[in-house]
């Protein structure tokens, strides 16, 4: 499981780790101090040879995709959180992905999550409406 931050509490992160697959995540702005001390602000994970960057806040909307493509030249995808607005977009070499939120949609039209299938070095993203 890849998580773009805002676990909010150590307890929730521990619950995720107890019930599911391994959790790879980054801290978010709403996370309690203990999480901010233990989780990185960004990280790159590799799944079947595919490099995926994780970060919470991808910066302002204007030119976001171009900034991320330049920053993560060696990655095939970036998964970010913070906005709670789903995004599945291909920009140059990079998938720019935001799963939205299964719990707090804020300005997004729906609750959502993202399923990434990685096979033979290729990513197939699927936005799932909840």
Predicted regions and their residues:
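Core catalytic region of metal-dependent phosphoesterases/phosphodiesterases
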Residues: 1-47
């Amino acid at each position: 499981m890849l998580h773009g931050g805002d676990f909010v509490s150590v307890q929730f992160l521990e619950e995720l780790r107890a019930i599911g697959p391994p959790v790879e995540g980054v801290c978010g702005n709403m996370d309690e101090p203990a999480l901010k001390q233990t989780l990185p602000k960004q990280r790159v994970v590799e799944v079947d040879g595919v490099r995926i960057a994780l970060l919470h806040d991808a910066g302002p909307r204007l030119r976001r995709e171009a900034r991320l493509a330049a920053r993560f030249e060696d990655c095939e995808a970036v998964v970010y959180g913070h906005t709670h607005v789903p995004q599945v977009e291909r920009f140059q070499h990079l998938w720019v992905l935001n799963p939205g939120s299964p719990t707090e949609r804020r300005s997004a039209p729906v609750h959502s999550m993202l399923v990434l299938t990685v096979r033979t070095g290729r990513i197939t993203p699927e936005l799932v409406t909840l």
